[in-house]
Swiss-Prot record:
<dbReference type="InterPro" id="IPR002346">
    <property type="entry name" value="Mopterin_DH_FAD-bd"/>
</dbReference>
<feature type="domain" description="FAD-binding PCMH-type">
    <location>
        <begin position="215"/>
        <end position="404"/>
    </location>
</feature>
<dbReference type="InterPro" id="IPR005107">
    <property type="entry name" value="CO_DH_flav_C"/>
</dbReference>
<dbReference type="InterPro" id="IPR016166">
    <property type="entry name" value="FAD-bd_PCMH"/>
</dbReference>
<dbReference type="InterPro" id="IPR006058">
    <property type="entry name" value="2Fe2S_fd_BS"/>
</dbReference>
<dbReference type="GO" id="GO:0051537">
    <property type="term" value="F:2 iron, 2 sulfur cluster binding"/>
</dbReference>
<keyword id="KW-0560">Oxidoreductase</keyword>
<dbReference type="InterPro" id="IPR036318">
    <property type="entry name" value="FAD-bd_PCMH-like_sf"/>
</dbReference>
<dbReference type="GO" id="GO:0071949">
    <property type="term" value="F:FAD binding"/>
</dbReference>
<dbReference type="GO" id="GO:0004031">
    <property type="term" value="F:aldehyde oxidase activity"/>
</dbReference>
<keyword id="KW-0411">Iron-sulfur</keyword>
<comment type="function">
    <text>In higher plant aldehyde oxidases (AO) appear to be homo- and heterodimeric assemblies of AO subunits with probably different physiological functions. In vitro, AO-gamma uses heptaldehyde, benzaldehyde, naphthaldehyde and cinnamaldehyde as substrates; AO-beta uses indole-3-acetaldehyde (IAAld), indole-3-aldehyde (IAld) and naphtaldehyde; the AAO2-AAO3 dimer uses abscisic aldehyde.</text>
</comment>
<comment type="similarity">
    <text>Belongs to the xanthine dehydrogenase family.</text>
</comment>
<dbReference type="GO" id="GO:0009851">
    <property type="term" value="P:auxin biosynthetic process"/>
</dbReference>
<dbReference type="InterPro" id="IPR036010">
    <property type="entry name" value="2Fe-2S_ferredoxin-like_sf"/>
</dbReference>
<dbReference type="InterPro" id="IPR036856">
    <property type="entry name" value="Ald_Oxase/Xan_DH_a/b_sf"/>
</dbReference>
<dbReference type="InterPro" id="IPR016169">
    <property type="entry name" value="FAD-bd_PCMH_sub2"/>
</dbReference>
Length: 1321
C-alpha cells in the first residue's frame, strides 16, 4: 500500500511500510523535499512559521476543502490523498510572485523574513475562505485576525496587518500605512489588485481525485479504518496484545504540541480515526446537536454559527462558537478535534476551554469503552471518571437545545482571562454560566469554572443551589461570591494561584449583575451592563515620514532587498542549506545543576539510542586546541563544562546522530551523574555574590563617569527618598530562527562553517582556538539571520564551535538546529539586576542628586556583560539628576551567562529613571508629567552628563520634541478625557503617559568592498550581517548614490544592478560585530569610501570620452584598459566623535480591566529623531518593531526560573511575546526630519534599538491607571486614598501583577462597601 499526496501539485508516492508513522509533515518537507519555506521555529504549533495549506477533495460533494495546518504537528501519514501548498506554491521568483508576496514586500512587512512564508499562507487561507465569485469579500476584521496566531519578533505587526487589510473589500485605502503602491491620501486603489483564488501556481491536482478510494491498511503500523466496526476490531486486537503492542489514536495530533513527550514515544500502531464517516458528522435533531468526535474545532464553530432555533437557544450556540474562536490559533483549530480536546482534559488534565463551556451548556459525551461498551455520560460524569484507557473512544458530543418555561428567559455567557485576547494562549481561568430567569427570579443555573489549576472543569453546585429561586440583589451577589472562595482553589504548584482565584468572583459578578432586577445606577457606573463587552478596536495607524531627495536614492523608502524572496520562502537561511552527503546532526546535553561535580554521562538503560554516532565532550578537543566555545577580544568562555558545572543550562556534551530528531531524542535519554558532596552551595542571587565577593572586574574605560557632587546635591534637597529598591528580571530574545550552524570539512585541514551569527569574525576565532588551527583555515559564511537582537552574538559561537569540533573529529559534516526549549534554556536573556537608590529633590520636583547601588547578575561567565554598566547609566542620564553617583557591581553567580539583547542595559536604565520620577511625583502629589518636564536637560546639562556625545546645541532636539509630541498627540486634551473617563467608570481605568529617551550609540570600524563586473553589474561585500534591519537595502542605496556621482547615462538605474552578497570571514576581515544600531551607518560609510575610490578611477575615462557615455560603455572601457574596478576600505570613525545621542518621545494611553488585570494599549504616538533617514521605510519598521519588543519586556514576557536557575517558561505555551492583539490599537509614528550633521553618515541616525525604550510609556501609563484603581479601592475600604499612590509597578506588568495591585479582592470590597452604604441610607 502506498501513501499518495501532492506538494505544490507535485506527486509523491511512498510505500506505507517504509514510512515511520511518527514522521511529521514538516520533517518530510524540510528533509525530503526542496521546499524550505516551511520553517521550524517552535515545534509545538505556537508560532505559525510552519503553516501550510492542506487541501482535501470530497468525492461525495465533489468539492475541494482548503485549510491551514501546523506542519510541525501534522503527521505525514495524515495527508494521504491531500495536496499541500507551501508559500512557494502560491508563487515564486521563477513563475512570478503571488500578490500576497508582493503586498507584504510593498508594505515593508518583512524584516528578518523567517515568519513571512507562514504569514503568506495564513493570509491566503483567509482570502480563500472569504472568496466569493473570484474576488475577496474579506473584511478588515477578518484580515487582522488572519495572522493573529502567527508570531513575528521584528516588525511590530503593523505593516503585516496593513498588508492583510489591503485585500479587504471594506478597507479605506487612506487608512493603510506606508507602502510602495500608493501614496498617503491617494484614493485610487487600482494599484492594489484584487485577490483571485485561481491565480496561484498550484491548485488541487486532478490526479489526486482518482487516487481517493478505500484501502485496507490494517497490516501496517498506520491504520485508517473506514467504519466504527472496523475500528472496534482493531482496538480489540490491540487490547488483546496490549503487553506487546502500544497504540495511539490519531485525529489532528495537535496534542503533541503541548505534550511533547509524545514525540519520543514510538508506538507500534497508529490508528487514524478521521476517515470514519460516523465520527465526522454533525447531526441536528429536535433535542440538540450531535458532533462527531473528530470534527475539527473550526468546523464545530462554523456549524454552531449556522444553528437556527429559538433566539435564546441560538444565542447559546453563538456564544459557544465565539469562545471557541479563542481556543489556540486558527491553523490549530483547523486540524484539532473537539473530541481530542475533551480527551486531553479528561485523561491528562489539560486546562481546556472546551470542557468548561460545554459543561455549562449541559453537554453529553458518547463513548465506546473497551470494558463497558457504548455509554452516554454527562460531560461532568465523563470528566470525573478515571482516565480513559488507551482503547476507549469518544464517539460524539451532544449539546442540547435548552427549552425554557413560558415567560422565562435564558442567559448564557462565557469568560476567559488570558495573556492574549484573540487566543493562542491558555487561560488563567475560564468560566461559563447558564441561567434561566423567570420574571426576576433565577429558576435554575449552571456555573462552570476551569483552567485554574484543578484536575478538570467543575460545576459550582453549592452556588447553583443557593441561587435557585432567588432574585439577584447585592446581598445575594455578595453571598454567592463568598461561597466561591471555598470552591475555586488552585492545586499546589499552580502559578499565580491567588490571581486565578480572584478572577472567579469577577466573572460571576459580571454575569449575575446582568440578572439583577435593577442594575446599579450609582455614579460612577459599574461598566458592565446587559450588553456584551465590546470587541477590541481594530488596529489603526498613521505614519508621518519625511522623504529626502537630496541624496537620491538614499533617503527614499525603497522596498527591503529580498522581501518577496522571503515571503515566498526562497530566501536561504542556514538550516535551508541542503545537507552534504553523510551529514550528521547534533544536540546539546546541558547541565541541570547550578554547581555540581560531573561524575559521568550515560544513556537510560545503558543502551545507545537509535542513530547516535558519538557524544562529543571536552575530552574530544584535539591536541593543540582549547576547550573554548566563545572567544572575543576581552576574554573567552569554555565550550563544555570541565569537572564542575557552573550553571543550569551550561553545555556538558554534544550528541551527534544520523538525524536531528534522533539527536534531540538521545539528549532526552541522556543521564548526567552529579555529585554535590563537599561543595559550597551555589551562588544564586546577586546578594550572595556580593556577600561572597564573587564579582567580575569592570574594565576601567568601560566604567561610566559620575557627575557632580551628590553629597552637596542631597544637602540642597527639600525632600529625600532613601534606599528605595527596584528589581528587574530577564527577557528571552525569541528570534524566530533558533541557533543553527553547519560545519563542513575541507581540504588541507580547513573547515567551512555556515553560522546564523551576528559575529562571523568571532565565530572564526572561537573555532580556530578550539580546534588548534590557524584562523585562515576557518571560513565562516553567513548570508542572512532569522532574527538576532543580540542573541546571535556571543551565544552563536559555541553552537558553531561544537559543530566544527564534531565535524573534525568524525570527518563528516555536522549541523544542528537547536530546538526552542534548549535554545531558551541555553541562551539566557537580559541581565537581571537589583537597584537601590536614594534621591534628593526640591518641592517643585527639581531633582538635585541621585545615588545608586546597582547589582547586575552577569551569570557564570563574563560574555559581553562588560558593556551593561555604561549602557545602563547612559540611558538613565536622560534626565538632569543634578548630581549622579553610583556603585555598580557585576556579579558572578551560578546562573546561566546572560545574553545581550536589543538595548542591553539601556532598557533597564530607562525603567530605573522612570520609576524614580514616578516615586518623586507620588511623594509630592504632583503630576508625573510635570516632574519629567522640569528635569529635562538643557544643552548645558546635557553636555555635563554626556560630554562629547552631546554634540552641538542645534543637534539637541529632545526639548522641542517633547512639546511637539504633546501637540500632535493632543496630550493635554487627552489627559482631561482620561480623567473624566476614570470618574465615570468603576471597572475600567485609563492612564496616559509621556516619556522621553536619550540613547547613546557608538560607531565602530566597518569594512566594505565594491566590485564592478564586466557587464556593469555591481557586487558589494560588507562586514555587517543582514538580520532583517534593512542593512543590505541601505547599502545598495548608498552604493547607487555614491557611484551615481559619475553622472553618466544609466547611473539612475544602478540600484537594480547592485547585489549585496553574504558575509565571508576570509573575504571580508575585521567584520566585527553587527549590533549597537550603527552597523548600517558604518557599512554605508565603508561602501561610500569604496565607491569614491572607484569614481576617482573612472573619472579619467569619462573625461577622455567623446560626448555622453553610458554606464555599461564606461565599464567596458575600464575593463579594456585594465582599470581596477574593485575597491576595499575600512571606515573608521577616528576623525569624529565615536558616539552621538538619539532622541525620542512617546505618548501612550492604556485601559485596564480591573476584573482581569488586562491592559489594552489604546494609542501610542511616537516622535523619533532619525536625522536624515537613509531609508524611512526601513527606519519606520525598526522603530515600530523595536517599540513592540519593548512592549513585551515591560508588559508581557515572564522569564521565570526555578530556585536553581532552570527556566520554567521555556516554550510558546508559557512565554508570551507580543501578538497582533496586544500592540497599540492606534499606532502613530512620526520621524523627525533632523538637520544636517556633517560628522554623521549623510546626517543619518540610528533606529534599531533606541525606540525600544519608548515602550516605557505604556508601562508608565499602566501605572497611572492602576493608581486610579487603587484610589477607588482605598475609598471602598475606608482607607486613606493617598496610600494607594505609593507603589511600584513591577516589570513585566502582566495581568496577575496589575490585578494584584488593583486589588485581588476588588469585587468583594465593592460589594461590602455597597452593602454598608445601603445600610446607612
Amino acid at each position: 500500500m502506498s501513501l499518495v499526496f501532492a506538494i505544490n501539485g507535485q506527486r509523491f508516492e511512498l510505500e506505507l511500510s517504509s514510512v515511520d508513522p511518527s514522521t511529521t509533515l514538516l520533517e518530510f518537507l524540510r528533509y525530503q523535499t526542496s521546499f524550505k519555506s516551511v520553517k521550524l521555529s517552535c515545534g509545538e504549533g505556537g508560532c505559525g512559521a510552519c503553516v501550510v495549506l492542506l487541501s482535501k477533495f470530497d468525492p461525495v460533494l465533489q468539492k475541494v476543502e482548503d485549510f491551514t495546518v501546523s506542519s510541525c504537528l501534522t503527521l505525514l501519514c495524515s495527508v494521504n490523498h491531500c495536496n499541500i501548498t507551501t508559500s512557494e506554491g502560491l508563487g515564486n521568483s521563477r513563475d512570478g510572485f503571488h500578490p500576497i508576496h508582493k503586498r507584504l514586500s510593498g508594505f515593508h512587512a518583512s524584516q528578518c523574513g523567517f515568519c513571512t512564508p507562514g504569514m503568506s499562507v495564513s493570509l491566503f487561507s483567509a482570502l480563500l475562505d472569504a472568496d466569493k465569485s473570484q474576488y475577496s469579500d474579506l473584511t478588515v476584521v477578518e484580515a487582522e485576525k488572519a495572522v493573529s496566531g502567527n508570531l513575528c519578533r521584528c516588525t511590530g505587526y503593523r505593516p503585516i496587518v496593513d498588508a492583510c487589510k489591503s485585500f479587504a473589500s471594506d478597507v479605506d485605502i487612506e487608512d493603510l500605512g506606508l507602502n510602495s503602491f500608493c501614496r498617503k491620501g491617494d484614493k485610487d486603489s487600482s494599484s492594489l489588485t484584487r485577490f483571485d483564488s485561481e491565480k496561484r501556481i498550484c491548485t488541487f491536482p486532478e490526479f489526486l481525485k482518482d487516487e481517493i478510494k478505500s484501502v485496507d491498511s490494517g497490516m501496517y503500523r498506520w491504520c485508517s479504518p473506514a467504519s466504527v466496526e472496523e475500528l472496534s476490531s482493531l482496538l480489540e486486537a490491540c487490547k488483546a496484545n496490549s503487553n506487546t503492542v502500544s497504540m495511539k489514536l490519531v485525529a489532528g495530533n495537535t496534542s503533541m504540541g503541548y505534550y511533547k513527550d509524545e514525540r519520543e514515544q514510538n508506538y507500534d500502531k497508529y490508528i487514524d480515526i478521521t476517515r470514519i464517516p460516523h465520527l465526522k458528522e454533525i447531526r441536528e435533531n429536535q433535542n440538540g446537536v450531535e458532533i462527531g468526535s473528530v470534527v475539527t474545532i473550526s468546523k464545530v464553530i462554523a456549524a454552531l454559527k449556522e444553528i437556527r432555533v429559538s433566539p435564546g437557544v441560538e444565542k447559546i450556540f453563538g456564544k459557544l462558537a465565539t469562545h471557541m474562536e479563542m481556543i489556540a490559533a486558527r491553523f490549530i483549530r483547523n486540524f484539532g478535534s473537539i473530541g481530542g480536546n475533551l480527551v486531553m482534559a479528561q485523561r491528562k488534565q489539560f486546562p481546556s476551554d472546551m470542557a468548561t463551556i460545554l459543561l455549562a451548556a449541559g453537554a453529553f459525551v458518547n463513548i465506546m469503552s473497551s470494558s463497558r461498551g457504548l455509554e452516554k455520560l454527562t460531560l461532568e460524569e465523563f470528566l470525573e471518571r478515571s482516565p480513559l484507557e488507551a482503547h476507549d473512544l469518544v464517539l460524539s458530543i451532544e449539546i442540547p437545545f435548552w427549552h425554557s418555561e413560558t415567560n422565562s428567559e435564558l442567559f448564557f455567557e462565557t469568560y476567559r482571562a488570558a495573556p492574549r485576547p484573540h487566543g493562542s494562549a491558555l487561560a488563567y481561568l475560564n468560566a461559563a454560566f447558564l441561567a434561566e430567569v423567570k420574571d426576576t427570579m433565577v429558576v435554575n443555573c449552571r456555573l462552570a469554572f476551569g483552567a485554574y489549576g484543578t484536575k478538570h472543569a467543575i460545576r459550582c453546585k453549592e452556588i447553583e443551589e443557593f441561587l435557585s429561586g432567588k432574585v439577584i440583589t447585592d446581598k445575594v451577589l455578595y453571598e454567592a461570591i463568598t461561597l466561591l472562595g471555598n470552591v475555586v482553589v488552585p492545586e499546589d504548584g499552580t502559578s499565580n494561584p491567588a490571581y486565578r482565584s480572584s478572577l472567579a468572583p469577577g466573572f460571576l459578578f459580571k454575569f449575575l449583575h446582568t440578572l439583577m432586577t435593577h442594575p446599579t445606577t450609582d455614579k460612577p457606573s459599574n461598566g458592565y451592563h446587559l450588553d456584551p463587552p465590546k470587541p477590541l478596536p481594530m488596529l489603526s495607524s498613521s505614519q508621518n515620514v519625511p522623504i529626502n531627495n537630496e541624496y537620491n536614492p538614499v533617503g527614499q523608502p525603497v522596498t527591503k532587498v529580498g522581501a518577496s524572496l522571503q515571503a515566498s520562502g526562497e530566501a536561504v537561511y542556514v538550516d535551508d542549506i541542503p545537507s552534504p552527503t553523510n551529514c550528521l546532526y547534533g544536540a546539546f546535553i546541558y547541565s541541570k545543576k547550578p554547581f555540581a561535580r560531573i561524575k559521568g554521562i550515560h544513556f537510560k538503560d545503558d543502551l545507545v539510542p537509535t542513530g547516535v554516532v558519538a557524544v562529543i565532550s571536552r575530552k574530544d578537543v584535539p591536541k593543540g586546541g582549547k576547550n573554548i566555545g566563545m572567544k572575543i577580544g576581552l576574554g573567552s568562555d569554555q565550550l563544555f563544562a570541565e569537572d564542575f558545572t557552573t550553571s543550569v543550562g551550561e553545555c556538558i556534551a554534544f550528541v551527534v546522530a544520523d538525524t536531528q530528531r534522533h539527536a534531540d531524542a538521545a539528549v532526552n535519554l541522556a543521564v548526567v551523574e552529579y555529585e554535590t558532596e563537599d561543595l559550597e552551595p551555589p551562588i544564586l542571587s546577586v546578594e550572595d555574590a556580593v556577600k561572597k565577593s564573587s564579582l567580575f572586574d569592570i574594565i576601567p574605560f568601560l566604567y561610566p563617569q559620575q557627575v557632580g557632587d551628590t553629597s552637596k546635591g542631597m544637602a540642597e534637597a527639600d525632600h529625600q527618598i532613601l534606599s528605595s529598591e527596584i528589581r528587574l528580571g530577564s527577557q528571552y530574545v525569541f528570534y524566530m530562527e533558533t541557533q543553527t550552524a553547519l560545519a563542513v570539512g575541507d581540504e588541507d585541514n580547513c573547515i567551512v562553517v555556515y553560522s546564523s551569527t551576528q559575529t562571523p569574525q568571532y565565530v572564526q576565532s572561537s573555532v580556530a582556538a578550539c580546534l588548534g588551527i590557524p584562523e585562515n583555515n576557518i571560513r565562516v559564511i553567513t548570508r542572512r539571520v532569522g532574527g538576532g537582537f543580540g542573541g546571535k552574538s556571543v551565544k552563536s559561537m559555541p553552537v558553531a564551535t561544537a559543530c566544527a569540533l564534531a565535524a573534525k573529529k568524525l570527518q563528516r559534516p555536522v549541523r544542528t538546529y537547536v530546538n526552542r526549549k534548549t535554545d531558551m534554556i541555553m541562551t539566557g536573556g537580559r541581565h537581571p539586576m537589583k537597584i537601590t537608590y536614594s534621591v534628593g529633590f526640591k518641592s517643585t520636583g527639581k531633582i538635585t542628586a541621585l545615588e545608586l547601588e546597582i547589582l547586575i547578575d552577569a551569570g557564570a561567565s563574563y560574555g559581553f556583560s562588560m558593556f551593561i554598566p555604561s549602557n545602563l547609566i547612559g540611558s538613565l542620564k536622560k534626565y538632569n539628576w543634578g548630581a549622579l553617583s553610583f556603585d555598580i557591581k557585576l556579579c558572578k553567580t551560578n546562573l546561566l551567562s546572560r545574553a545581550i539583547m536589543r538595548s542591553p542595559g539601556d532598557v533597564q536604565g530607562t525603567y530605573i529613571a522612570e520609576a524614580i520620577i514616578e516615586n518623586i511625583a507620588s511623594s509630592l502629589s504632583l503630576e508625573v508629567d510635570t516632574i519629567r518636564k522640569i528635569n529635562l536637560h538643557t544643552h548645558e546639562s546635557l553636555a555635563l552628563f554626556y560630554k562629547d556625545g552631546a554634540g552641538e546645541p542645534h543637534e539637541y532636539t529632545l526639548s522641542s520634541m517633547w512639546d511637539k509630541v504633546g501637540v500632535s498627540s493632543k496630550f493635554e486634551e487627552r489627559v482631561s478625557v482620561v480623567r473624566e473617563f476614570n470618574e465615570s467608570n468603576m471597572w475600567r481605568k485609563r492612564g496616559i503617559s509621556r516619556v522621553p529617551i536619550i540613547y547613546e550609540v557608538l560607531l565602530f570600524a566597518t569594512p566594505g568592498r565594491v566590485s564592478v563586473l564586466s557587464d556593469g553589474t555591481i557586487v558589494v561585500e560588507i562586514g555587517g550581517i543582514e538580520l532583517g534591519q534593512g542593512l543590505w537595502t541601505k547599502v545598495k542605496q548608498m552604493t547607487s548614490y555614491a557611484l551615481g556621482m559619475l553622472q553618466c547615462d544609466g547611473t539612475e538605474e544602478l540600484l537594480e544592478k547592485i547585489r549585496v552578497i553574504q558575509s565571508d570571514s576570509l573575504s571580508m576581515v575585521q567584520g566585527n560585530f553587527t549590533g549597537g544600531s550603527t552597523t548600517s551607518e558604518g557599512s554605508c560609510a565603508a561602501v561610500r569610501l569604496c565607491c569614491e575610490t572607484l569614481v576617482e578611477r573612472l573619472k579619467p575615462l569619462m573625461e577622455r570620452s567623446d560626448g555622453p557615455i553610458t554606464w555599461n560603455e564606461l565599464i567596458s572601457q575600464a575593463y579594456a584598459q585594465s582599470v581596477n574596478l574593485s575597491a576595499s576600505d575600512l571606515y573608521t570613525p577616528k576623525d569624529t566623535p565615536m558616539q552621538y545621542l538619539n532622541y525620542g518621545t512617546a505618548v501612550s494611553e492604556v485601559e485596564v480591566d480591573l476584573v482581569t488585570g488586562q491592559t489594552t494599549v489604546l494609542q501610542t504616538d511616537i516622535l523619533y529623531d532619525c536625522g536624515k533617514s537613509l531609508n524611512p521605510a526601513v527606519d519606520l519598521g525598526q522603530i515600530e518593531g523595536s517599540f513592540v519588543q519593548g512592549l513585551g519586556f515591560f508588559m508581557l514576557e515572564e522569564y521565570i526560573e526555578d530556585p536553581e536557575g532552570l527556566l520554567l517558561t521555556d516554550s510558546t505555551w508559557t512565554y508570551k511575546i507580543p501578538t497582533v492583539d496586544t500592540i497599540p490599537k492606534q499606532f502613530n509614528v512620526e520621524i523627525l526630519n533632523g538637520g544636517c550633521h556633517e560628522k554623521r553618515v549623510l546626517s543619518s541616525k540610528a533606529s534599531g534599538e533606541p525606540p525600544l525604550l519608548l515602550a516605557a510609556s505604556v508601562h508608565c501609563a499602566t501605572r497611572q491607571a492602576v493608581k486610579e484603581a487603587r484610589k477607588q479601592l482605598c475609598m471602598w475600604k475606608g482607607e486613606n486614598g493617598s496610600s494607594g499612590s505609593a507603589f511600584q509597578l513591577p516589570v513585566p506588568a502582566t495581568m496577575p501583577v496589575v490585578k494584584e495591585l488593583c486589588g485581588l479582592d476588588i469585587i468583594e470590597s465593592y460589594l461590602e462597601w455597597k452593602l454598608h452604604d445601603n445600610s446607612n441610607l
